Each structure stands twice: as C-alpha cells, then as structure tokens.
Amino acid sequence: FCKVHICERWEEGRPLLRRELNDADVAVVGSYFSDGVAAANEVLDSAALVKAFYDIDTPITIAKLQAGDEEYLRRDQVPQFDLYLSFTGGPMLREIENSFGARRVVALYCSFDPHRYRISEMDSKYVCDLSYMGTYAPDRQAKLEALLLRAAQGVPDKTFIVAGPQYPSEVSWPKNVKYIIHLEPKFHPAFYCSSRFTLNLTRKHMVKVGYSPSVRLFEAAGCGAAIISDGWAGLESFFHPNDEILLDESTAEVVRYLYEVSPEEAAGIGKRAQQRVLAEHSADKRAAQFEELIGAKSLARQYA
C-alpha cells in the first residue's frame, strides 16, 4: 500500500523527495531526522495541499527549541506547517501554539497493530507472576529496581522475567528473576500472555510532561495483559485505574497486587484494557484520525 525509499545520504534523497512532492496532496516530516531542517524546507516550499510535522519526540523537541538547539527543526519553521501532530497530548499542545506560533497542534498518539498484538497461547518459557519488557534506560532503572527487583527479593515464592537489551553487567538479578537479553517481536504476544501481570515503566521526560502513552503500553493491552504501571498525568484518559490498569508507586504495592488480585480479576483487567485499546488506539483507528485531520475527504472531492 506504499512505497519506501531508503537513501544513505541526503544529497541522494533530495531529488527523489522533490519528485514525490510534485503531485503530493499531503507531506509530512517526522521528528529526530538528521536532515529534518532541510527536509522541512523542501516540504514547506512545495505545492502540497497539507504540510505537516509529526513529532514523536515532543518533550525532547520542545526542550531543544527552548535551548536554541535546532538539530532537526527550526523555531521559525513551526508556524509554517498547516498541522503539528504530536505523540504527546495535554498542556504541551497549548505551549507549542502559544510559545512557538504553531497554527494547529493536535495529539496523534502512537498506536498498535491488533493483528500482531493479540491474545496468544501461553508459552512455558515466559510463565511468571510479573514480567517487564524494555530496553535499559538509566532514568527508568531506579523504578525497575524498586518495583520489580526489590519486590522479587521479598517474595521468593513468586517468579519474574525481564526482557530487553543493554542492561549493564553489574545489575544484580535475584534468583527468581529470569533475564532475557533479546526477545523477537513475534514472541511478544506470548510473553505478555504468559505472565499474570506485566509492568509498564515510563521514561522521566515523558512522566514530566504527561499524556505520553508508549507503544509498548498499547501493545501489552492489545494482548490482554494485566498491566501494573507507574503513574503520570493523563494516564486516566487512556485507561481507567483499578478497572483497566493497576497503578503502583512502591514495592509494597506491587507485592500486594501479586498476592491480593486473583487470576480471574487480573484477566478481567486485561480484557477491559484490550477492549479499550481496540476501540481507541489501534493502527486503523489512528489512520482514520489522520485522514480526518488532513481533510482527506475534502482532498478527494477535488479530484472527483
């Protein structure tokens, strides 16, 4: 349904981009692209009917612009886009409008593929009481140690699994914690479906601004996982606490969930979370939102 062109150098990509822009109805530039400033100029100078910037790193982008860092987007380019789409919602949207002069700022959150992330058969390799999937991140590690590793040390009768690369060799894994350095995406559904609960931890800059759900959060919910998550502003607009997701702020709280929430209750939480993301956060839902935002029906009428 699409063409993908991969260019090693911007000099190779520029002529191709210009050709594609000649008859483009909509042109979108993504964030954290090393030649983003040059690409944005090409888009803004084009005849595309709708010119948009899609920021999947909104807190980082805004922090950079505030510091005068224009690595992939210039401050003066922001007001020139017809539409500024953001992975982050909430108050930050108004800040982009008020401080940077964006014409129209709208949250277009991440999404998940329900054909890949769905309820799967359990796999004995991943059966445990609490799982966590995530690449090592220094600003998340303290939470992982408090909410999983310390919990594991205190409940030797429970089992835990951590999956993700780049964890330092000095990390001390308790005996009842299994560490998997890499898990292929095709095994993700079985991973989520084989643990009683799965833990969601959020990067510090995303917690600070709030309204920044991760792809992993939606993918886990798509698999019907009972999610235990750290809290952040806006989380309740994606999942109802204690009904579709459980919130934790301490080791003791995690341990309490492990002992007091029955398998049936956990399954119910996971099922309701799955229903929520299927209704609101699947890839097709997000595509429909995008089409509505760019006025796809109006564009189509011009060619009728």
Regions found by a protein language model. Name each.
Residues 1-9, 55, 61, 103, ...:
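Catalytic binding pocket for nucleotide-activated donors in carbohydrate/polymer assembly enzymes
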Residues 22, 46, 79, 100-103, ...:
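Structured loop/turn residues at beta-strand edges in well-structured enzyme cores
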Residues 49-50, 83, 104, 159, ...:
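Proline-centered loop/turn at the N-terminus of a beta-strand
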Residues 113-197, 207:
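Conserved catalytic-core segment of nucleotide-activated headgroup transferases in glycan assembly
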